[in-house]
């Protein structure tokens, strides 16, 4: 009996888990090989010996060629003279990032060379956004060392404009969400930076517990880059009130946490205080992490926060946060004036506490209208494999472990890192893409998640080309009210489907679909039929709040 089975049996005996989950649930099928995904992640060496190598990478779904099908981008590591052992020198220059084009038939084609996006740096996170409002998604790659920014040429190729744009941040960057922080109509980018790795410090440190952790090194400040509207960006971090010289950001999340229509920043740091920067609406932010209960773990300790997932877990109209870590994880429920840690009472701690969590996801995998939890797991200091977690939200405030019922994949073990979701086969349910350390990522097709009714909302700015990043969708069907912010950068170093997915259960239509645009004007649609991708374009006559 595995650890998961033993713990689950114990939990059942002491009645911590509610009534058994119905057996007719969706399953996930590992289609990696059949889909043609063969790019293996590498940390650029033959032995895992330091934190640069062990941090891993994320993964991204995005439609780079505007054909309506989600493509895949995978950052990779490299052999680095300041990081890697000399034994790995033969890998130098041989490792690249990979772009897979979705063929629309369940398979993907490697188009990295044709698209000219095969960066050879030490890659971690990636994100895509239409920074120049020309209708196609541009690509930003976070590296250990200079970051890379590719402008989409609209013909299937990209051009490296890193230096000219001012976005070649030379620090150790992990994540980069895009949003219009100042309301001027173009997208800015927040770059989450990690720590100042010292290649000579602890170089020969090989304790049984593994290489030194993040607190052995100095932190690095993050950066907010303002889009100047001319193809260049300016660092406005200090002026915006965001400068924290000793942060150790593992990722960055943008969402509206206080329902004022402005996008805030939540920054999970590694082993120290986390930041919640509330948007003041005047181009400035203030850190209220401590006041809101977001700075530390339930015991007042700094936790090894990985990639946070955001969503309205209890359907009360306020965005909650789930943060995986090396312990039990943290489910932080938004109580308007503060956040309450409900990890233990929801059953998440019992299951997630067995593993080291990295890529956390809140998504409605079964289409019943309630957000479920997926976590990609893997040891932080060794290549020890772990099972991933899938917990179903039963709608009563409890999560039920359904992993072993959800397909053979969940009986296997990997060294998981980033994870994301998206409907890559356009069948109405959410599929998974899981990045693994020093291994091939796994593409997991959701089979049966569309048995319930669903609605996918594709939000566009005037003209219908660019995604309306930062908009909020509220879908009402009967007594169930769901909200979602259109921010595709989510979880650990990853980006997912930019469309907002809503499970409607047995409802054949949504009573209302309300869109609050980034400028806080609104559009309301009524009696919207289920089982469709609804494209909503911002009209000039949208009603102002």
Predicted regions and their residues:
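Gly/Ser/Thr/Pro-enriched helix-cap/hinge segments flanking short amphipathic alpha-helices
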Residues: 23-27, 45, 346, 350, ...
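Blade-edge beta-strand/turn elements of extracellular beta-propeller
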Residues: 28-31, 107-116, 157-167, 231-243, ...
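Repeat-based blade/solenoid architectures
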Residues: 37-58, 93, 115-127, 166-177, ...
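Beta-propeller blade termini
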Residues: 56-66, 101, 122-133, 137, ...
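Hydrophobic beta-strand segments that make up the repeating blades of beta-propeller
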Residues: 72-76, 134-143, 189-193, 264-269, ...
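Short, conserved, GDST-rich strand-edge loop motifs in beta-rich repeat architectures
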Residues: 75-92, 193-217, 374-384
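Beta-propeller blade signature
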Residues: 95-102, 220-227, 278, 388-394
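Asp-box/WD-like beta-propeller blade repeats and closely related beta-sheet repeat scaffolds
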Residues: 111-131, 141-181, 191-215, 219-221, ...
């Amino acid at each position: 009996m595995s650890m998961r089975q033993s713990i689950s049996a114990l939990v059942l005996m002491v009645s911590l888990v509610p009534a058994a989950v119905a057996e007719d649930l969706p399953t996930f099928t590992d289609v990696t090989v059949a889909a043609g995904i063969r790019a293996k992640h590498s940390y650029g060496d033959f032995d895992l010996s330091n934190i640069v190598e062990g941090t891993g990478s994320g993964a991204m779904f995005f439609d780079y060629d505007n054909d309506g099908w989600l493509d895949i981008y995978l950052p990779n590591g490299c052999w680095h003279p300041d990081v890697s052992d000399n034994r790995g020198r033969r890998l130098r220059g041989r490792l690249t990032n990979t772009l897979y084009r979705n063929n629309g038939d369940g398979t993907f084609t490697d188009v990295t060379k044709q698209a000219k996006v095969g960066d050879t740096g030490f890659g971690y996170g990636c994100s895509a956004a239409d920074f120049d409002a020309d209708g196609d998604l541009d690509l930003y790659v976070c590296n250990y060392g200079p970051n890379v920014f590719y402008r989409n040429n609209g013909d299937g190729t990209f051009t490296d404009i890193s230096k000219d744009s001012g976005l070649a941040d030379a620090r150790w960057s992990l994540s980069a969400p895009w949003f219009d922080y100042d309301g001027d109509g173009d997208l800015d980018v927040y770059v989450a930076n990690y720590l100042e790795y010292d290649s000579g410090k602890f170089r020969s440190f090989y304790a049984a517990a593994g290489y030194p952790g993040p607190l052995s090194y100095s932190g690095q400040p993050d950066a907010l880059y303002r889009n100047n509207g001319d193809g260049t960006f300016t660092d406005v971090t200090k002026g915006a009130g965001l400068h924290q010289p000793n942060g150790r950001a593992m990722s960055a999340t943008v969402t509206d946490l206080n329902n004022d229509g402005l996008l805030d920043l939540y920054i999970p740091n590694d082993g120290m205080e986390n930041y919640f920067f509330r948007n003041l609406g005047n181009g400035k932010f203030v850190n209220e992490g401590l006041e809101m209960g977001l700075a530390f773990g339930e015991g007042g300790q700094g936790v090894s926060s990985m990639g946070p997932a955001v969503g309205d877990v209890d359907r009360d109209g306020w965005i909650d946060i789930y943060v995986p870590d090396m312990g039990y994880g943290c489910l932080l429920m938004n109580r308007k004036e503060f956040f309450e840690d409900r990890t233990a009472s929801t059953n998440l701690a019992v299951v997630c506490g067995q593993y080291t969590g990295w890529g956390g996801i809140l998504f409605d995998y079964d289409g019943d209208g309630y957000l479920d939890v997926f976590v990609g797991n893997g040891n932080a200091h060794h290549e020890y494999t772990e099972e991933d977690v899938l917990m179903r939200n039963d709608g009563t405030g409890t999560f039920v472990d359904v992993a072993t019922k959800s397909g053979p994949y969940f009986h296997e073990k990997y060294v998981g890192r980033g994870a994301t979701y998206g409907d890559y086969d356009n069948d109405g349910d959410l599929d998974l893409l899981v990045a693994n350390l020093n291994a091939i990522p796994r593409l997991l097709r959701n089979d049966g998640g569309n048995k319930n009714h669903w609605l996918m909302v594709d939000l566009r700015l005037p003209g219908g080309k660019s995604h309306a990043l930062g908009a909020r969708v509220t879908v009402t069907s009967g007594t169930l009210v769901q909200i979602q912010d259109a921010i595709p950068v989510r979880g650990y170093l990853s980006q997912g489907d930019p469309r907002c997915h809503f499970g409607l259960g047995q409802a054949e239509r949504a009573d209302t679909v309300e869109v609050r645009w980034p400028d806080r004007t609104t559009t309301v649609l009524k009696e919207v039929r289920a089982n469709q991708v609804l494209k909503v374009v911002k009209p000039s006559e949208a009603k102002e709040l």
